[in-house]
Amino acid sequence: VAATAGAPGRIPPVFRLVLAGAAVVLLFFGQRLQNPQPWSYDEYYHLGLAREMLSSGLRMESFRWTPFSITFDHFADGEPLFHVLLLPFARLPLQTAGLLGVLLGQIFLVGAFAAALWIVRAPRPWWFVLALGGLGTLFAQRMEMCRPHVWLIGFSVLVAALLVERRWKALFVVCALFALAHAGAWIAIPLAILWSLSGLLAHDGPGERRVPWQPVAVAAGGWLLGQLVHPDVPENFRLFVITNFVIPFQATTASNAALHSQLGTELSPPGLDLLLEQWPAFIAPVLVAIALLSRPQLRSRATLTVGLTSLAFLLAGSLVIRRFFELGAPLALLALALVAREWWARRLPPPLPGWGRMLAGTAIVLGILWTFLGLRAHGVQNASAPLGMAAWLGEHGVAGERVFTAQWGDSAPLFYFAPQLQSLVALDPTAFYLKDPRLFAAYVNVVSGQDPDPARTIRERFGARWVTIPPSLYPRFLNRLAHAPGAQALYGDENYWVVDLGKR
């Protein structure tokens, strides 16, 4: 084995890497333990879908709970492997199942990152693993959620490491599993293309200035295999187009004002204040950029591929869709590890003799403190607000009845607590808009308080008996509905009201 982390000619102690990974997992999981309720509305959906799979099997042709969504007509699970991994504890109480799902994702991501560092023989890899704890609040919030995006990040890091070391067989297997774990797994293909093309710019020697076909073929072949063994083939290919192209396009172009008004924060850019709070995540990419610009000999296939990819995701996450930021931050950390590897291999003088370890340790500690103090200062994302409302409807709603959710995201907790009911759309409002743009416009008209008779519209056009309203978010709609004949508020707490419009 070639020289690895620690010093040239010496393999770093594995236990340091394992201990660093365990420390980071404990750090993140300890934060979730302090706030064990769901941190994201999507957690209700994923845990509910896994529980449903235990009864109906892995293949579902229709998501019958949301008749106004395109998934009602054609359903494909975008993350079947993720949901299979949730099956063993899907029937446990929500809080317990959510904690176990979060822990599983944290172990995978941290383990994948540590494995990637080991694969590429990064110097002192435990430092980079510890730095995962200080990448800012956006990345930390993602780590605290039982959602498949955590697995997207872990698989992406593994793909990058296997490309760097040209382990084609392992890359094929990882890409196939990646395709089953997340609908966005196709990003392995452009990553492989970039790796092939980066040799034209790299300073790896004349023999490396070529464009090999193996990485692209292997990545594409592995991804395609995953799609072909998908339980929902061929509908998964339709889902692939909608998830990766239609939804991001609609989110970034504001082509429809009604749809744009309902998009979640993850599909919008972060504000300047929030972006500035992520300063720990910018340390690694800034160092990578400085090193590659000032030291041409450090521009290898590895550093260019991972460095440029991380910068692209960070830029997109900062300016367009914040979800990309969470992927760019750990990739930038891996890019910094690769730059450090090149630095060691070329025996370049230390940039800060005698100060490197102290500065690295200080930056890691400050990043961790800033990240977790920031989480406490902002408070956790309040995804537990609909618990009482959804549980009440689970007890009082009759099978086949329909719920009009003022906030479309409430379909997810209703799916978990009241699976006998139907609602509007789960996960993304674009699925509602694509099925019936006019009806979607009517929905937006109702919840914005512009419809003069919302009760009639809800009864006649949506066929719903129940209406769920967060009163602080929709005061005008609530005021109009309160004056509707026959409307009764049967449940209320500080977060939600449930209004009964009467049986049809």
Each language-model region and where it sits:
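Short hydrophobic/aromatic helix or loop-helix immediately within or flanking a transmembrane segment
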Residues: 68-96
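Transmembrane-helix motifs of polytopic, lipid-linked glycan transferases
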Residues: 100-122
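Short hydrophobic alpha-helices at membrane interfaces in multi-pass membrane enzymes
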Residues: 130, 162-178, 209-218, 304-311
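Membrane-interface alpha helices of multi-pass inner-membrane proteins
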Residues: 136-140, 157-162, 169-184, 188-192, ...
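Membrane-interface transmembrane helices that cradle and orient dolichyl/undecaprenyl
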Residues: 156-170, 203, 288-298
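Signature aromatic-anchored transmembrane alpha helix within multi-pass, membrane-resident enzymes
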Residues: 219-224, 334, 338-373
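Short periplasmic/luminal acceptor-recognition loop of GT-C membrane glycosyltransferases, typified by
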Residues: 397-437, 460, 464-474, 499
